[in-house]
A protein has these predicted regions:
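A short SAM/SAH-binding and catalytic strip from SAM-dependent methyltransferases
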Residues: 84-95
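Short conserved loop adjoining the S-adenosyl-L-methionine
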Residues: 73-79
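S-adenosyl-L-methionine-dependent methyltransferase catalytic module, highlighting the catalytic core
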Residues: 98-106, 110-197
Length: 197
């Protein structure tokens, strides 16, 4: 994913979050989004991350982050104890995405999910014409070194929400550093969703 797409993604997420609220970022990486939300939205933020180097980077930046595998659950958090739980560029990398979403919805009043759309048209072309697993800016890994375990599309995720009575309060789709308004499952490189239950 390009830095510009990443920045647009963070802007969309920031716009969905109310000022002064509590945020839990699951799979927060180096804390770039957490830092942005603290600075621009004055949120009370905490991150969860598995990667030790990313945790050290977060702590060095003054962020509150602890190490945990979100596949094991969020037992430290009471129901609806956080206003926003974020799963951005994380869902496709966890072993149990259904469990992660349900735990996020249990803990958070609202949940923000963002992921690469594995049915983006350039991915489809690479599979169809080259007969190979796609390598693109949003999916920059070879098949043998990808952290992605689950390959979902925007349509798959919407169907999942419908089946599980999860309300999609807002959605945004990004491609080539701009918003996508039509045929998001084909033209959207990244899907973002604001959820509640």
């Amino acid at each position: 994913m390009t830095k510009q797409t990443h920045a647009i993604e963070h802007k969309v997420i920031s716009n969905w979050i109310n000022t002064g609220t509590s945020v839990l970022d699951l799979g927060c990486g180096d804390g770039e989004l957490l830092s942005l939300l603290i600075r621009n939205k004055l949120v009370r933020a905490q991150g969860v991350e598995l990667n030790e180097q990313a945790i050290h980077n977060c702590v060095a930046a003054g962020l509150s982050v602890f190490q945990q595998d979100i596949d094991t659950g969020l037992t430290e958090y009471a129901d609806k104890s956080v206003e926003y739980v974020i799963l951005n560029q994380t869902l496709q990398q966890v072993k149990k995405p259904d469990f992660a979403i349900k735990e996020a919805l249990r803990v958070g009043k609202k949940v923000i999910v963002g992921f690469p759309n594995f049915c983006y048209f350039t991915d489809r072309f690479q599979i169809f014409f080259r007969g190979r697993v796609p390598v693109t800016p949003s999916l920059p890994y070879e098949w043998y070194d990808t952290p992605n375990l689950h390959f979902l599309s925007i349509a798959d995720f919407k169907e999942y929400c419908k089946k599980n009575q999860i309300t999609i309060e807002n959605e945004a789709f990004i491609s080539k550093n701009r918003a996508v308004r039509v045929f998001p499952n084909l033209l959207g490189e990244v899907g973002l969703f604001l959820l509640s239950k």
